[in-house]
Every structure is written in structure tokens, then in C-alpha cells.
């Protein structure tokens, strides 16, 4: 064994061994308990970043630990390879998205191997290959036949100059990212999948997900947004149709003083025919895309349509306004406004001088003060005619019943969730398998024409999708008749909604899934990824699983038993102000810093002498230039060091602060482990351990070893607090470094301890552990070694520490046998100099003894 720890030599050697032996390839084995450990698949952007490294290290630690427990562990990896960034990169680099993507995959695959992740590479998949997306296309056609897919018009961002649709991220300050033309909103036909048909099940089954973070479940509950309320119909004077609104607060209905409709509502459009102000307002709303997140904070604007609706219970005429906070795609595109009891309605009414009518009493029974804000709490009704004096629930039911009896109301359950629009007017995605015949009939692409292959040898102009620009591509024949293919492609969330299931049978040619393999491995036992995916990906992931279940492919209701959302990786961020006042961000690698005695950064400059402003720790990002390249760190310290730091620096679900000093610390620790094994093995062979012949000190050390095994097992397995597991191993290492190594049993005990330490560290730092296991002559490869089991007998304490007090003040701490009697403890305490001093010449009036813990002698 060489004396120095040289990761650059051992890591490549061990990785080659894993490749040659196909160590992590698995097949179904009914005789073994399975464990499916999955990290969210990466987008092949070109290089791994520290967020990837953290995610995949957590997954690898769990997978290797479960493997050592004797389970049949599947840990696959693949590439979420379609998407908009490839189009931009292709234009920039004068290439096509396909070669750019495949080059990135090859590069990043090597990076993953360099980090020593134990993946089953035989299952690797890339979602941009026809072998993958053909089954997604087939499944889509089946959903269409089931009535779960439909087409309707929906608004998109449209660049009138380039005559093209823009993704949300391509709209910058309301303008096209490429030509700076003002972006318009345009309605175009798009494909939707009826996720709303599964809304109740998606909501109710959250209760089955005991091992998902509550934050994620709450976000999904709110996103699905189930509410119970009443749909109310208003007659509108001088208008051919009625207006329907939905409210969850029918108890406030007597306080409704105006209605608001979306700018795109037919009533607003009709009113605008003779109202230039309203027509201009509608235009403004049409060209302003409002994300729901921004709705709460944006300025509320509106224009009176001139129409008057009739309140069905009071007969009063109330105005109908067009307002920018009402969206056509939500509900009916019309809302009732109760400004006395809804803050948004209150602000709008105050701004435009509309009537504000209170109908709910304040908590103390007085009329509410509405001079500053609305009263939004529930309470007792007044100012409401026959409903006065009713509390919230009674009023809800009474008003709902009355409206129903009059034929103008209906109790309804509503959802915030909208159907999933899967059409994208992009090139680099899976073609949507639908065709239109000459007579206008729309139908699915026949099975014998699947997959509809996306041409990869294309020229990108940065404006129009190559399959839209080439009229020949769309031409096809169906049943001998000419037809045109759909030129939209799927939302890339489609591919990432079912990849986890395809990993169970990546070579299967007969269909989307081999049910036997899928049902052996599924559901996923632990799924690891960022909380930013809580509502989009993780909802579609659950939805797709239910679709596949209902198609008879899988027999479970949910795709993953446990979800672990890892925290973000933070790093120091620095900038200097340029000549034009702009911020120039400087990489923390290039910052020369001064620290105070507490290690805080007080001053910083770069190599060019710029005084730097330190903004603290923030998420690693390109915009702040504070990303740390994992490859550089691996080349400097080795993969094991980077992995160990990642798992030690912070609990897995909390943010991790990148500190190179911490990486250096992890490296020093691994050098200490190496050195201890080197010194131990240099002394030659070891005798067998005789546990019955150990001295008290040897027993105490062995107790520490087995207590550490018990703690680390619990920390990794049950608690998943990996940082505390590493801390416990480090603490044990400190004790082993000080332990005597001269006697035969000292060395036998050291052998047992080091074999345990190396196995406990193996999930975290597999390369060094593989090597040290061989040097310690462990049985076989460590990859097939069992997890160490704590010896219960070794952990039993045969002595205990008792605190001795005289009149409540601590005078000594003594070690006594665990079975010592009170008399024996008193006798032993009396031998302590300080205790004897305070007992000299006084009478012990009372003895308080807590067995094995405390002896208090009360004297007087």
C-alpha cells in the first residue's frame, strides 16, 4: 500500500473496475427486496453544476447504502434532452440542436462517471430519441381515443415582426428577445390533456404520500385549488346573454355592487364596438401577459362597459366593468365583486368610485369600519334582508338554497387547476402525432406511421421551426388520402412525466412499458430533486402514473413513495461597479478576501485591483458568476472529497454554503483515514479478535465502535441526516487515532474498527473505501460487502458515571459498576477528596440517590 493518499490514481482505477464488472447493472429478482432510487434526470446543458452534484450524490449515497443492506437496487440515469435552450445554442454555434445535444450528453456522461455515481448505465435513455418518444406519441393517440385529449384556441405570445410564437422566457419586458418588437397576444388552436378529469384523485391521493414534504403537498393542494361554492346567473339589460359568476362566499352576496368581466369576454367585446376607451383597454390587456403570480401585485385597472346587470335577490341594477384582474381562461371570465368584504374588489371600487356595501358585522358585533380596507373575515350578516343574523355557514346554505330555488344558482365544486396545454410552437420537441385530412377531419396518426420522427439534420434560422418552415415535412397520406401533419411539438414536461417508468424496461419493443418489469420496480422508493418542481413536473408525474395505471400498464396509484427535495447550493457573490454604473460580477475563485477574527469577509478585491462589493451567499448562478465548476474541484481534491463535503456541510434538505476551506477539511479527513489504514496494515497480519479477553479500555473503544455503527445506521437509514452520520464517523476516527496499537488484541480491535469505518464511509466516498477494503483484506469487493451490524452486547455499559453532590452542589463525578448498590456508591464517593472534605465533622441528615445518575448528600 502506498503511503500517500492519491485520489487521481485510485479513482480512475476503481471507476474502470465498476465499468468492466458492470457492478451496478441489475435485473428483476423476486427473491430479493427491491429498492428503486431515482434522482431527477438532468437537462444536457453542457456541463454539470454543483446543484447536479449535490442531487446525484444524495441519491448515490442512499442507493449504495440500500445495496449494502442486501437489496436489489436500481439507480438509473438519463437525459431530459428536448427543449428551447438547444435551439438558441444551435443558432449561436451555427449547428443543429441534435448534434449539440448529443455532444453535451457525451461530455456530461463522463463528468457523472468521474464523480463515481453507481448508475446502471445499461438503462440510460435520452428523451429526444425516436425509440423513446414513439411510445409517448402512441400513448397520446390512445388518450385522444379515450376522450382525454382535445383541441381549443388558447393565447400565445406572438412576435408580429418574425411572425412566430415566443416562449414566455423569450419575452423580455414585453418585447421579442430577438428583434425587440412589442409582443402581442394571439389566440391559436392548441392541444390539451384533461388533467382536470383527475383533479379529485390528484388531490385526495396526496393523503397517501406520507413521505413527501408537507410543503410540496400544500403547493399541489393550492394549485389544484378545490373549492365549494355557488354559480350564479345574472340577467343583463340590453344584452342577449346572461352572465354567470362563481363565488365561494355566497354569504356576502347581498353586498355585491358590481360585476367584472375579462377584457376578452364577449360582453366586453360587444360594448367596445361603440366605446373607443374600452376598445383601447381591451387591446392593452390582450398584449399584456399576466402570470398568476403577478396578479396580486399589479395595478388593477378597468373600464365601465355601460351594461347593467340585475341583482337576482335585490332587483338592483349594478354596473358591469371590464377589468384586467379577470382572466378568460379561469372560470367563466366574469366575477361578482363585493368590495366591503374582498380587498381586491375594495381597491378597485375605491379607485373608480363604485358603491361599497357592508353586509358582515365585525367580530365585536359592530358595523365594520371600511374607511381603510375591506373586512375579509367571516361573521354574522346584517344589511341583508331576510338573511340578517345568520352566521357564515347558515348564510352560505340559505342564500345558495334560495338562488337554486329561483333557478339562478347552482352549487358547484370548482378547481383552480386547468387542463394541460401540451402544444409548443417550437422545433426541438417530439412531434404531436395528429393529422388533418383535406376535408378538415382531425385524427390521430395511424399506429403504422408511428413514430412521427423529428428530422435532426436541419438549419436553424432562430425564427421559425424548421418543420413549420418546410411545407413538405407536413405532407403525408392517411388511408390513401392526402393529409397534413401537426407541426407543433409536445411540451417537454411530457417526456419527463413517464421516464421513471421506462427505466424499468428501456429496451422493451412491444409497447410503452413491460408491465412485469414496471410492477417489479415501481413505485420509485425515493425520488430526489429540487422543490422548484413541486407543482409542474411533480403534478404531471403523478398524473401520468394514473393515466398509465388506467391503461393497465402499472398497478400502483402513485409513482414515488418518498420525495426528498435537496436544498440549493450557495456561494459567495462579489461585484464591482463599472464605468457606466453597471455591476460586473466577479467569480469567488478570483476574489482576494480579507476576513475578521470570526472569519467574516470584511474586504475584497480582484486581481485587477477593483474594490469588490460582497453581497453575501447566494444561489450559484451564471448571472452572479458565482458558480464553482465541479470538474475543477474533482481534479484538485478528488471526487470522494467533493462528495464528502457535499454530504457533511449541511442537512440534505437545507441550503448548502460552498466553502473551499470545508472542502480542504474533508480532504484532510480522508488523508487521516488513509494514514491510519496504512500504519495499521504496515504492521502485517492481524490475530482474531477475542471479545472475552479485552481490557476495560479495549471494551470501551469497542463500545464506541458499535455505538457509532448503530448511530450511523439510524442516521442514514431512518433519519436521512447524512451530515450527522459523517460527524459520528469523524468522532470515532479521532478516538481510533489515539488508540494503542502495540498489543495483539489492540491490533485485532483496530482491524474490526477500520473494516467498520470503511464500510460506513463507502456510500459517501466509494473510491477510497474500495481501495482500503482491499488493503484491509476485506472479503470480496466492498460493493458486495454487507453493511456493518452493531453488536448489542458490545454496546452494553458495564460502568456508569454518577454525579456526587453535597447540599446540592457538585463535588465529584465518579465511575461505578452499573449494578453497584447505593451503599457501594456512597462508599466510593467517600473516597473522593472533595467529598470527604465536606463530610468531615458533619452529620448526613438525608440521602437522595437516583440509581446510576446522582447521589446528593444533605448535611447539617
Curated annotation (Swiss-Prot):
Q: What CDD domains does its record include?
A: Anticodon_Ia_Leu_BEm, LeuRS_core
Instruction: Spell out the SUPFAM superfamilies in the cross-references.
Output: Anticodon-binding domain of a subclass of class I aminoacyl-tRNA synthetases (SSF47323), Nucleotidylyl transferase (SSF52374), ValRS/IleRS/LeuRS editing domain (SSF50677)
One GO biological process term is: leucyl-tRNA aminoacylation
Q: Which GO terms describe its molecular function?
A: aminoacyl-tRNA deacylase activity; ATP binding; leucine-tRNA ligase activity
> Where would I look for the motif 'HIGH' region in this sequence?
42-52
Q: Where in the cell is it found?
A: Cytoplasm
Arranged from A to Z, the UniProt key words for this protein are: Aminoacyl-tRNA synthetase, ATP-binding, Cytoplasm, Ligase, Nucleotide-binding, Protein biosynthesis
List residues binding ATP: 622
Known catalytic reactions: tRNA(Leu) + L-leucine + ATP = L-leucyl-tRNA(Leu) + AMP + diphosphate
Listed EC numbers: 6.1.1.4
Where in the chain are disulfide-linked cysteines found? Answer: none
Q: Name one GO cellular component term.
A: cytosol
PROSITE patterns from the entry? AA_TRNA_LIGASE_I
Can you say what this protein is called? Leucine--tRNA ligase
The organism is: Escherichia coli O6:H1 (strain CFT073 / ATCC 700928 / UPEC)
Amino acid at each position: 500500500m502506498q503511503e500517500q493518499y492519491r485520489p487521481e490514481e485510485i479513482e480512475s482505477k476503481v471507476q474502470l473496475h465498476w465499468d468492466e464488472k458492470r457492478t451496478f447493472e441489475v435485473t428483476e429478482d423476486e427473491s430479493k427486496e427491491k429498492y428503486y432510487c431515482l434522482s431527477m434526470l438532468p437537462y444536457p446543458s453542457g456541463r454539470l453544476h454543483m446543484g447536479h452534484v449535490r442531487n446525484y450524490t444524495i441519491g448515490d449515497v442512499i442507493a449504495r447504502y440500500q445495496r449494502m443492506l442486501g437489496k436489489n437496487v436500481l439507480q438509473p440515469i438519463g437525459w431530459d434532452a428536448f427543449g428551447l435552450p438547444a435551439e438558441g445554442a444551435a443558432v449561436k454555434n451555427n449547428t443543429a440542436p441534435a448534434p449539440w445535444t448529443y455532444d453535451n450528453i457525451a461530455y456530461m456522461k463522463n463528468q457523472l462517471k468521474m464523480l463515481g455515481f453507481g448508475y446502471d448505465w445499461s438503462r440510460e435513455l435520452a428523451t429526444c430519441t425516436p425509440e423513446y418518444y414513439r411510445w409517448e406519441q402512441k400513448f397520446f393517440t390512445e388518450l385522444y381515443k379515450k376522450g382525454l385529449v382535445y383541441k381549443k384556441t388558447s393565447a400565445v405570445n406572438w412576435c408580429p415582426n418574425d411572425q412566430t410564437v415566443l416562449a414566455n422566457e423569450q419575452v423580455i419586458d414585453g418585447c421579442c428577445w430577438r428583434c425587440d418588437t412589442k409582443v402581442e397576444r394571439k389566440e391559436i388552436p392548441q392541444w390539451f390533456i384533461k388533467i382536470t378529469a383527475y383533479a379529485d384523485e390528484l388531490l385526495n391521493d396526496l393523503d397517501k404520500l406520507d413521505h413527501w414534504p408537507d410543503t410540496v403537498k400544500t403547493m399541489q393542494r393550492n394549485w389544484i385549488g378545490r373549492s365549494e361554492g355557488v354559480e350564479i346567473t345574472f340577467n343583463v339589460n340590453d344584452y342577449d346573454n346572461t352572465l354567470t359568476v362563481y363565488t365561494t362566499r355566497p354569504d356576502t352576496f347581498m353586498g355585491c355592487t358590481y360585476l367584472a368581466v375579462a377584457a376578452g369576454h364577449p360582453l366586453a367585446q360587444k360594448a367596445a364596438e361603440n366605446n373607443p376607451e374600452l376598445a383601447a383597454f381591451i387591446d392593452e390587456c390582450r398584449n399584456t401577459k399576466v402570470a398568476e403570480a403577478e396578479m396580486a401585485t399589479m395595478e388593477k385597472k378597468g373600464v365601465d362597459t355601460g351594461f347593467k346587470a340585475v341583482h337576482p335577490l335585490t332587483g338592483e341594477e349594478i354596473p358591469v366593468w371590464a377589468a384586467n384582474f379577470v382572466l378568460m381562461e379561469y372560470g367563466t371570465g366574469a366575477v361578482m365583486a363585493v368590495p366591503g368584504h374582498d380587498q381586491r374588489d375594495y381597491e378597485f371600487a375605491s379607485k373608480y368610485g363604485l358603491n361599497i356595501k357592508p353586509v358582515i358585522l365585525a367580530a365585536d358585533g359592530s358595523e365594520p369600519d371600511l374607511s381603510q380596507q375591506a373586512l375579509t373575515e367571516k361573521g354574522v350578516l346584517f344589511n341583508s334582508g331576510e338573511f340578517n343574523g345568520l352566521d357564515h355557514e347558515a348564510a352560505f346554505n340559505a342564500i345558495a338554497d334560495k338562488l337554486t330555488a329561483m333557478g339562478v344558482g347552482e352549487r358547484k365544486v370548482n378547481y383552480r387547476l386547468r387542463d394541460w396545454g401540451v402544444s409548443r410552437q417550437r422545433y426541438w420537441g417530439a412531434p404531436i402525432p395528429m393529422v388533418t385530412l383535406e376535408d378538415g377531419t382531425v385524427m390521430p396518426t395511424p399506429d403504422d406511421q408511428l413514430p412521427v420522427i423529428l428530422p435532426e439534420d436541419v438549419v436553424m434560422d432562430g425564427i421559425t421551426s424548421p418543420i413549420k418552415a418546410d411545407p413538405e415535412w407536413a405532407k403525408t397520406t392517411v388511408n390513401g388520402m392526402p393529409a397534413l401533419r401537426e407541426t407543433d411539438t409536445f411540451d417537454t414536461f411530457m417526456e419527463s412525466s413517464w421516464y421513471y417508468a421506462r427505466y424499468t424496461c428501456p429496451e422493451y419493443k412491444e409497447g410503452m412499458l413491460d408491465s412485469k418489469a414496471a410492477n417489479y420496480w415501481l413505485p420509485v422508493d425515493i425520488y430526489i430533486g429540487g422543490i422548484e418542481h413541486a407543482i409542474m413536473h411533480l403534478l404531471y408525474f403523478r398524473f401520468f402514473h394514473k393515466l398509465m395505471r388506467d391503461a393497465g400498464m402499472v398497478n400502483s396509484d402513485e409513482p414515488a413513495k418518498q420525495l426528498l427535495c435537496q436544498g440549493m447550493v450557495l456561494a459567495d457573490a462579489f461585484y464591482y461597479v463599472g464605468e457606466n454604473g453597471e455591476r460586473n460580477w466577479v467569480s469567488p475563485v478570483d476574489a482576494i478576501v480579507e476576513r475578521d477574527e470570526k472569519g467574516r469577509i470584511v474586504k475584497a478585491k480582484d486581481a485587477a485591483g477593483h474594490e469588490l462589493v460582497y453581497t453575501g451567499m447566494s444561489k450559484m448562478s451564471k448571472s452572479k458568476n458565482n458558480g464553482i465548476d465541479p470538474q475543477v474541484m474533482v481534479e484538485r481534491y478528488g471526487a470522494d472529497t467533493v462528495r464528502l463535503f457535499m454530504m457533511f456541510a449541511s442537512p440534505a434538505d437545507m441550503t448548502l454554503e460552498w466553502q473551499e476551506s470545508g472542502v480542504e477539511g474533508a480532504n484532510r479527513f480522508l488523508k487521516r483515514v488513509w494514514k491510519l489504514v496504512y500504519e495499521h496494515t504496515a504492521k502485517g497480519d492481524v490475530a482474531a479478535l477475542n471479545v472475552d479477553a479485552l481490557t476495560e479500555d479495549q471494551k470501551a473503544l469497542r463500545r464506541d465502535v458499535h455505538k457509532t455503527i448503530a448511530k450511523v445506521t439510524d442516521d442514514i437509514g431512518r433519519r436521512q441526516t447524512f451530515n450527522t452520520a459523517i460527524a459520528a464517523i469523524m468522532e470515532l476516527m479521532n478516538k481510533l487515532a489515539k488508540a494503542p496499537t502495540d498489543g495483539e488484541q489492540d491490533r485485532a480491535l483496530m482491524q474490526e474498527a477500520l473494516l467498520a469505518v470503511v464500510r460506513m464511509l463507502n456510500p459517501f466516498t466509494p473510491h477510497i473505501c474500495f481501495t482500503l477494503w482491499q488493503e484491509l483484506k476485506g472479503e470480496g469487493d466492498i460493493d458486495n460487502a454487507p453493511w456493518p451490524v452493531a453488536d448489542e452486547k458490545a454496546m452494553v455499559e458495564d460502568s456508569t458515571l454518577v454525579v456526587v453532590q453535597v447540599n446540592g452542589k457538585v463535588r465529584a463525578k465518579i465511575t461505578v459498576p452499573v449494578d453497584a448498590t447505593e451503599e457501594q456508591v456512597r462508599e466510593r464517593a467517600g473516597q473522593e477528596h472533595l467529598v470527604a472534605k465536606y463530610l468531615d465533622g458533619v452529620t448526613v441528615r438525608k440521602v437522595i440517590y437516583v440509581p446510576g445518575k446522582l447521589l446528593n448528600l444533605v448535611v447539617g
